[in-house]
């Protein structure tokens, strides 16, 4: 099980809500994934309606909602979005996203750290999307973030763990959960992240744009379970030379 702040999760697969063809397909895929934490952008929610097309189906699923500040370009804008989410959804959990670069959607490290400090002081449980920078992740941990969410690759790129070496350092140093966010494009990428020692992964695009999102969600669920088991089992270390599985030593001694 995974504990973040005051909440325990059985699933280490977190999911997003963007890019699905329709709300029904979204809820089917999320249910198939087994995910218990689902993120959504406040900018996409119709707060004036009592039956929002995204929010209402998620509430029926019974998952924990993690509103995010996607669209914010500064720490101040992120704080405004977070307060809006807290008021509208009655949650103090927030995924901090500040990425002013519209082409690559890379997080702004300076504004992210600043925003994290502001949000923590305002009573939020903060999960920041950030670069795979070990120093930044440690600083985010020190200011009180409940977890860190370093990227594997740019958002929606499906390139996997391009930042693998840095992720390994982050995982080794972290005293809070590490959730790999962005770039996870295949179940094998999620499995690799869990084998590396990550506490969880967040997947959206790879499931939402798959030919069959429900089956892809199931595949990710299985991959996450396999990755966790592999990490717990302790995989054999790679070697540069062959090591016989059945040595001839004892056999030759008998001869």
UniProtKB/Swiss-Prot annotation:
Q: Catalytic residues per the record?
A: 95
| Intracellular or extracellular location(s) | Cytoplasm
What pathway is this protein said to act in by its record?
Answer: Cofactor biosynthesis; thiamine diphosphate biosynthesis
Record keywords? Cytoplasm, Schiff base, Thiamine biosynthesis, Transferase
Q: What is an example of a Pfam family matching this protein?
A: ThiG
> Per UniProt, where does 1-deoxy-D-xylulose 5-phosphate bind?
156, 182-183, 204-205
Query: GO cellular component terms?
Result: cytoplasm
Entry annotated with the keyword Cytoplasm: yes
Q: Which GO terms describe its molecular function?
A: thiazole synthase activity
Q: Which InterPro entries match?
A: Aldolase_TIM, Thiazole_synthase_ThiG, ThiG
Instruction: Give its E.C. classification number.
Output: 2.8.1.10
The reaction(s) annotated as catalysed by this protein in its Swiss-Prot or TrEMBL entry are:
[ThiS sulfur-carrier protein]-C-terminal-Gly-aminoethanethioate + 2-iminoacetate + 1-deoxy-D-xylulose 5-phosphate = [ThiS sulfur-carrier protein]-C-terminal Gly-Gly + 2-[(2R,5Z)-2-carboxy-4-methylthiazol-5(2H)-ylidene]ethyl phosphate + 2 H2O + H(+)
Transmembrane stretches in the record are: none
For this chain's UniProt record, which GO biological process terms are given?
A: thiamine diphosphate biosynthetic process
Its chief place of residence is cytoplasm
UniProt cross-references to SUPFAM superfamilies, sorted A to Z: ThiG-like
Entries under CDD domains matching the protein: ThiG
* Subunit text: Homotetramer. Forms heterodimers with either ThiH or ThiS.
Entry function: Catalyzes the rearrangement of 1-deoxy-D-xylulose 5-phosphate (DXP) to produce the thiazole phosphate moiety of thiamine. Sulfur is provided by the thiocarboxylate moiety of the carrier protein ThiS. In vitro, sulfur can be provided by H(2)S.
Q: Which family does it belong to?
A: Belongs to the ThiG family.
Spell out the protein name for this chain: Thiazole synthase
Species of the source: Photorhabdus laumondii subsp. laumondii (strain DSM 15139 / CIP 105565 / TT01) (Photorhabdus luminescens subsp. laumondii)
Q: Which gene encodes it?
A: thiG
């Amino acid at each position: 099980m995974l504990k973040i702040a005051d909440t325990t999760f059985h699933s280490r697969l977190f999911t997003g809500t963007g890019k699905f063809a329709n709300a029904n397909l979204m809820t089917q895929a999320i249910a198939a994934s087994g995910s218990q934490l689902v993120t959504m952008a406040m900018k996409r929610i119709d707060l004036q309606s009592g039956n929002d097309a995204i929010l209402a189906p998620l509430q029926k699923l019974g998952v924990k909602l993690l509103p995010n500040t996607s669209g914010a370009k500064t720490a101040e804008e992120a704080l405004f979005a977070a307060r809006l989410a807290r008021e509208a959804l009655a949650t103090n959990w927030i995924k901090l996203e500040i990425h002013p670069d519209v082409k690559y959607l890379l997080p702004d490290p300076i504004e992210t750290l600043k925003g994290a400090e502001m949000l923590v002081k305002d009573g939020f449980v903060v999960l920041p999307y950030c670069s795979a920078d070990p120093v930044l992740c440690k600083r985010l941990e020190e200011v009180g973030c409940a977890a860190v969410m370093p990227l594997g690759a740019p958002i929606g790129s499906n390139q996997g763990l391009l930042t693998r070496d840095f992720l390994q350092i982050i995982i080794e140093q972290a005293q809070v959960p590490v959730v790999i966010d962005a770039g996870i494009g295949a179940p094998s990428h999620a499995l690799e992240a869990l084998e590396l020692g990550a506490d969880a992964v967040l997947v959206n695009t790879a499931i939402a744009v798959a030919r069959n999102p429900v089956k892809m969600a199931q595949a990710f669920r299985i991959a996450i379970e396999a990755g966790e088991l592999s990490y717990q089992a302790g995989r054999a270390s790679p070697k540069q030379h062959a090591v016989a599985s059945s040595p001839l030593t004892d056999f030759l001694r008998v001869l």
